[in-house]
Amino acid sequence: MHELLTKDNITSTDLQTLLEAREKGEADFLLVDVREDMEYEMGHIKGVDMLKPTSMFQQWAESFLDENKDKAVIFTCRTGSRSGQVQHVFKSNGMERAINHYGGIVTYSGDIER
């Protein structure tokens, strides 16, 4: 397991490192954007696996936890605030490798898809 996947919070530089490692098969994780649809469509980090808006958290949280409890999951948003809240909830409910992308997309200098 990649050492960055043991942290509670990672920086944008860390995320770029992990995305590059995942492309080479050296890291395994899910990258989940918790912003709203409109924000996502305006631009998102290349490599995001799924969009799970926080406004719909109650609808997707339980099944997401059941399906991904044992995986490393990195949550991202615009600044790291919403993703930090989501990460805290999942960590508190037994997802040991829930990770917050601290700083969010506004601090990310890697590839953005529109």
Question: Where is each model-derived feature located?
Answer:
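Rhodanese-like catalytic fold shared by cysteine-dependent sulfurtransferases
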Residues: 1-30, 37-72, 81-114
